[in-house]
Amino acid sequence: MSTYLGLIGGCVKYEADHHIGKDQHVWAYSANMEPVLKVKSGATIHLETWDCFTGQVQTEDDTVEKLDLARVNSATGPIYVEGAEPGDSLSVTLHRIDPGTQGAGMVIPEWGQLIHKAKAPATRIFKVKDGIVHMNDRVSFPAVPMLGVIGVAPAEGEIATFAAGRHGGNMDDHFNRVGSTVHMPVFQKGALLAIGDMHASMGDGEISGTGVEIGGDVLIEVNVLKGKAARWPITETADSWYTHGTTDDDLNEAIKLACEEAAQLLVEQWGFTWEDAFIFLSVAGDVG
């Protein structure tokens, strides 16, 4: 199957086995989600995604207090992957991330490390063209597209797409970009994958609460790793592995969880002792 993405100045062809439009999306992950697509392991999928505001922000007058916050962070899907079941991992390789032409960033009241210096609320519109993000006439920088939300159905209950956890979700990891593979534990049959929250660029830390929030098109490949369940999502790049840990309110505990997952990976996959893993991560690992 071939699908096409129309861009200014031409048309980009997506060679994919399947396609899902952006209006097929969810606002929360749960075992009760009805899949919109069923695919085999190894399939490629072209997904359209909304920006995190679901099209509500078009001008700098569209500030956060004017938005319907129930319509934030939609995730395209869910996708049922045949053969995926608890005890496995689902690997999602990001082959392409093509943002649209306009995105937005915000200052949100009572949010972020510089809120005491900035006037809130505020919105800035960014234009994206030829791989460059333009903030204004004086400021531009290279686009580094990434996906904030990549997740599967959790073991129990319902988790909003705004949150992150062992199921993935709103990880906002800027390494979840083209060329990376995100490995996630499977908790429900079929995994029930959903993806969204594209950014044309996002700083590590996303200190105002937003990146360049933008819609666009994504090409992914899904693979089931039988009997190799991770405890937390792991992002694999060409030269590194990035582990994740999440808590509600304790940064040190989140760091501990991410470190434990990294050490476990070294012990199980490379034969490290826990002592060697501890020392290696201290001398060659980064916490972010």
Describe the residue ranges of each PLM region.
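Bacterial Sec-dependent signal peptides at the C-terminal "C-region" and cleavage site
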Residues: 3-15
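N-terminal, Lys/Arg-enriched amphipathic/low-complexity engagement segments
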Residues: 17-67
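Short, structured beta-strand/loop micro-motifs enriched in basic residues and often containing a Trp
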Residues: 21-30, 68-76, 159-167
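A generic structural signal for residues embedded in beta-strands
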Residues: 47, 89-92, 184
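Short, Lys/Arg- and Gly-enriched loop/turn segments at beta-strand edges
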Residues: 52-63, 97-107, 190-200
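Intrinsically disordered, low-complexity linker/loop segments enriched in Gly/Pro
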Residues: 96-178
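Conserved mixed alpha/beta catalytic, RNA-binding, or beta-rich assembly cores of soluble enzyme
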Residues: 143-252, 263
